Amino acid sequence: MKGTGLNNFPQFGVMEGVKILVCGGAIAGPFGATLLGEIGAEVVHFESPKNPDSVRGHYGYSQNHRNQLSMVADMKTPEGLEIFKKLIKWTDIFIESSKGGTYEKMGLTDEVLWEINPRLAIVHVSGFGQTGVPEYIDRASYDAVGQAFSGYMSFNGTPKEAMKVSPYLSDYVTALNTCWTALAAYVHVLRTGKGESVDVAQYESLARILDTRPMEYFTDGKEFPRTGNKDTQAALFSFYTCKDGGEIFIGMNGYGPVRRGYPLIGLPKPGDGDPEIDEILSGWMADTDLGRRLEAAMEKFVSEHTVDEVEKIMLENQIPCLKVYTLKDCAKDPHWKARDIFVEWDDPMMGRVKGLGIINKWKNNPGEIKWGAPLFGENNEEVLKDLGYTEEEIEDFAKRGITASFDFDQTYEIYKLEELFPHYREGFTERWKKEEE
């Protein structure tokens, strides 16, 4: 927000007073800082005047950079590097996302940063990590690269085609990993007084949630063919298409659901005298003759009922299930409304917008959206003043291109915003009218 600097961040939330400097663009690094900023952390997003965040001009930037300040300076100049170092001295946690080894090549090793701030928690986020095979370390990465290299993509899709999980699973899982590792490093600093550095690799973040599949591969040599939405292990634990085309997930597994659920789909309960089904305790393997018999019974049942009918019948009998929601369904659902997931906030480019709010409900110290994503370099002046620079120095930095800030017409030209978001100019104009008043 215009007028906010390092010394007047709003005070709220469980992360109140914790300072975070984040360098890098897109999702994997900055989004973790955003989550902490929404519960009170003081976040400054540091960008290059020649290489702005690649998601600026898109909805993702608006939602994923709330409660942040924007500082833009060229670290390749002595003055810009000095600004960066002063921010390192100010901050508690430094998060950077770039190709592995980038900061080391710039001469900004962890040891150099700790000379400036011995109590600094550092998180390096990259596609392939800071160590390992050099030709991998130096590669750029996108979400789909992380999904492919982690092996995650190989489990999703059909036998004919692998499929990436949308939207941007690898990026967001890495951001969540970044978030908790930053906090763990910070706790270590608080406990010991000594800095810590963490190397977060995008592909490893996703590999860590491959469930037991790596263990099964290395222990038993098991391989996992792609089967679409059908569970490869348990029968009656999958997605089904109903009479009206509606889709629903049903999980008829566990001692209770098996006994309550089988009669609903025309099967006897275990113990009723069917020699095959009497063997079942809490479920059965999918790829067996009995598993195929169970699936055939369910397919027949859903083909005779609409998705709403199936959901009602299953829920009345305490069978875990839910039809596949669209965002339209989410927006209308009373439970979503009751928990205030969708909220409005003011965006400097678009005006009043609506999207996802703050997840996790804090009883005593709730999170808040104080302002929308900042404009490019919007807080340069305030941040530089709080770092001790004079007005003359700040003006000189801008004139020489060491710092840069938002230029509306230039931004339109770069991002073709009129094509993407026709309401941008109107929202921007309204915002600055209010500020001038």
Swiss-Prot record:
This protein's UniProt keywords: Transferase
Query: Pathway listed for it?
Result: Lipid metabolism; bile acid biosynthesis
Matching entries from InterPro entries are given as: CoA-transferase_III, CoA-Trfase_fam_III, CoA-Trfase_III_dom3_sf, CoA-Trfase_III_dom_1_sf
Q: Which domain of life is it from?
A: Bacteria
Gene Ontology BP annotations:
bile acid biosynthetic process
Task: List the active site.
Answer: D171
**Enzyme Commission number(s):** 2.8.3.25
GO terms of molecular function: bile-acid-CoA transferase activity
Is Transferase a UniProt keyword of this protein? yes
Catalytic reaction(s) noted = deoxycholoyl-CoA + cholate = choloyl-CoA + deoxycholate; allodeoxycholoyl-CoA + cholate = allodeoxycholate + choloyl-CoA; allocholate + deoxycholoyl-CoA = allocholoyl-CoA + deoxycholate; allocholate + allodeoxycholoyl-CoA = allocholoyl-CoA + allodeoxycholate
Q: What's one Pfam family the UniProt record gives for this protein?
A: CoA_transf_3
The similarity comment for this entry is: Belongs to the CoA-transferase III family.
Q: What does this protein do?
A: Functions in the bile acid 7alpha-dehydroxylation pathway, which forms secondary bile acids via the 7alpha-dehydroxylation of primary bile acids, and is carried out by intestinal anaerobic bacteria. Acts as a bile acid CoA transferase with broad bile acid substrate specificity. Catalyzes the transfer of the CoA moiety of secondary bile acid-CoA compounds to primary bile acids. Can use deoxycholoyl-CoA and allodeoxycholoyl-CoA as bile acid CoA donors and cholate, allocholate and ursodeoxycholate as bile acid CoA acceptors. Shows no activity when lithocholoyl-CoA is used as the CoA donor.
User: What's the protein called, per UniProt?
Assistant: Bile acid CoA-transferase BaiK
Originating species? Clostridium scindens (strain JCM 10418 / VPI 12708)
Name of the encoding gene? baiK
